[in-house]
Regions:
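Conserved alphaE helix
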Residues: 73-85
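Conserved activation segment of eukaryotic-like protein kinases, specifically the C-terminal portion
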Residues: 128-142
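Conserved protein kinase catalytic/activation segment
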Residues: 103-115
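Helical subdomain adjoining the active site within ATP-dependent kinase catalytic cores
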Residues: 166-247
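Conserved structural core of kinase catalytic domains
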Residues: 26-74
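Catalytic-loop of the protein kinase fold
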Residues: 86-102, 106
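Activation of the activation-loop gatekeeper triad in protein kinase-fold domains
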Residues: 116-121
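ATP-binding glycine-rich loop module of kinase domains
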Residues: 1-30
Length: 248
């Protein structure tokens, strides 16, 4: 967080080379912009990315607080906002690459804004390998570096949506399964995960057919979750307005 030209901005520094920063961030990338001292006598010039500062908390922090307070109304608002964001992501020809609640800011104005696009996929990167695999707590367990296309956000989008819908129905799930590393579920053992099983039972009991079908996709053997976009569209149908935030 810095002040520049009378405005509060964000400044991200890169201590090691990163692929495709120019393609991802465009003119926001300032190459060899900052000199960092590594010792009293030596230092290194590093690349930086200048962006808009977004006042707010991460989605993970906001969800944890709302669940602890049993604030179902706030959780219901968050899940509606997230489903619209998820639909936009999974129908785009780009992908975030490391979609997780810690990389989404809930702005003070009530918008959801993704941050940290370093692992993004753009159409120009077709055929390349992924520079990183994202955070394991939200990624399909079968994801490898070879999986690098516009669909790599499918699994984390479905997982986060499922967890938010479950918490909006029963915030006490956070007491039993909430985690600083994830939300409720462990992808590596999703089929036997007690939180996942409890979620399916909850959705079935409440007649939440769309959410039940999205949750079922989390056991798919592939990263591409066929039908996810249509299910998310059905979930947000009739919802008015947009969860807008500054473009990347």
């Amino acid at each position: 967080r810095i002040r520049l030209g009378g405005r509060i901005r964000s400044l991200r520094c890169y201590l090691r080379p990163m692929r495709h920063l120019k393609e991802i961030y465009g003119q926001r990338l300032l190459e060899k912009e900052l000199y960092l001292h590594t010792s009293p006598e030596t230092g290194v010039w590093v690349d930086t990315v200048l962006g808009n500062w977004i006042e707010g908390s991460t989605l993970h922090e906001t969800v944890a607080q709302a669940a602890a307070l049993r604030d179902r109304e706030s959780l219901q608002i968050l899940v509606r906002l997230f489903d619209r964001l998820a639909l936009a992501l999974v129908t785009d020809d780009r992908a975030h690459g490391d979609l997780k609640p810690e990389n989404i800011i809930v702005g003070d104005d009530g918008t959801l804004c993704p941050i940290d696009f370093d692992a993004s996929y753009l159409p120009a990167f077709a055929g390349e390998i992924s520079p990183e695999l994202g955070t394991a707590a939200y990624q399909h367990p079968a994801r490898t570096a070879a999986d690098f296309d516009e669909r790599i956000d499918d699994y984390p989008a479905a997982l986060i949506s499922t967890a938010l819908h479950a918490l909006a129905e029963d915030p006490t799930l956070w007491d039993r399964y909430g985690s600083s590393d994830g939300l409720l579920y462990t992808p590596q053992r999703i089929a036997s995960d007690p939180a996942y099983r409890e979620t399916l039972a909850l959705f079935e009991k409440r007649g939440m057919a769309v959410q039940y079908r999205i949750a079922q996709l989390l056991t798919a053997p592939t990263l591409r979750l066929f039908g996810l976009a249509e299910l998310l569209a059905e979930a947000v149908r009739g919802d008015i307005g947009e969860a807008g935030c500054p473009r990347r």
